[in-house]
């Protein structure tokens, strides 16, 4: 069974826009289809909004290519079927990522958002690993935890 992975917007920027070397193994796994990367319309809309911002200087064509790539790697889940996680994030825009990981647990949410990372200990008790480490999904401890759940 492939590990279920939710990637927040900042991690997607590392993978698809910034070409961050720390994200290269994650990108390779996404390209190989060895992860069950999941998204919703709301998470796609947020990512599209962010990459469309002036600071990134991405042409419409480049934005379309990036979105096409992410959609080809990810499985789309309907926002309407998401369970509400018992932990709340102060940043309401990030709650959808938390709810998505909670719905599909055991799952990993990779995020650099400090508000999201604050709930990591509580989430882990319910089968959701929250980490800022791009490559924790490849660690033995994550594989063992998901196998136990």
Which residue stretches match the model-derived regions?
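Acidic, PIN/NYN-like endoribonuclease modules and their adjacent C-terminal/linker elements
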Residues: 87, 104-108, 114-149
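Acidic, metal-associated active-site segment
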Residues: 91-108
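Membrane interface segments of multi-pass transport proteins and intramembrane proteases
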Residues: 56-59
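PIN/NYN-family metal-dependent endoribonuclease catalytic core
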Residues: 6-7, 23-54
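Metal-dependent nucleic-acid phosphoesterase active-site entry motif
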Residues: 1-20
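Acidic catalytic patch
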Residues: 42, 64-88
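Hydrophobic/aromatic ligand-binding patch that stacks against planar heteroaromatic rings
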Residues: 29, 100, 119
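Short secondary-structure boundary segments
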Residues: 9, 41, 112-114
């Amino acid at each position: 069974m492939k590990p279920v992975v939710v990637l927040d917007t900042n991690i997607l920027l590392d993978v698809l826009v910034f070409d961050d070397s720390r994200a290269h193994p994650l990108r390779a796994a996404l390209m190989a289809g060895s992860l069950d990367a999941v998204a919703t319309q709301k998470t796609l809309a947020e990512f599209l909004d962010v990459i469309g911002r002036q600071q990134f200087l991405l042409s419409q064509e480049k934005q379309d290519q990036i979105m096409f790539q992410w959609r080809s790697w990810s499985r789309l889940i309907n926002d309407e079927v998401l369970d509400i996680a018992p932990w709340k994030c102060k940043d309401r825009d990030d709650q959808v990522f938390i709810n998505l990981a909670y719905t599909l647990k055991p799952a990993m949410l990779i995020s650099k958002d400090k508000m999201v990372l604050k709930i990591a200990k509580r989430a882990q008790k319910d089968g959701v690993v929250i980490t800022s480490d791009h490559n924790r999904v490849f660690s033995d401890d994550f594989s063992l935890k998901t196998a136990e759940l």
